[in-house]
């Protein structure tokens, strides 16, 4: 994948990430229910580290899909209130919910193996 052909928004479609904002966050993510683990990808436009995750996610789509996550995404540079809600110290940040309960968060992209291990731990705590 060349730098010229990389479109960072491709990851949203590739992982079926639903956009959320501060107004609809609770209805979509927290009250969205079910036993599926929800992962909210908080990012910022032109954020270098966010784009590193997006590139990695496009390269490892299948592995990320196999984690059985319901994905959401929000640009916290545009939605500052949502960034404040989570007292972000940096992006990307991944916040996890299940059955209305916030289970944890990952700040920064740790790499695929570490991300998979963290998600597996959360899945096991069902």
Segments (PLM) and residue ranges:
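N-terminal leader/targeting and pre-domain segments
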Residues: 1-36, 118-126
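Thiol-based oxidoreductase modules, predominantly thioredoxin-like and allied folds used
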Residues: 17-22, 42-44, 61, 66-81
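Non-catalytic, surface beta->alpha helical segment in thiol-disulfide oxidoreductase systems
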Residues: 90, 95-126
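The canonical Cys-X-X-Cys-His
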Residues: 47-50, 94
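Typically the conserved alpha-helix immediately C-terminal to a functionally engaged Cys/Sec
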Residues: 49-65
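A short glycine-leucine-enriched loop at secondary-structure breakpoints
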Residues: 85-89
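Short active-site neighborhood of thiol/selenol oxidoreductases, capturing the structured segment around
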Residues: 32-46
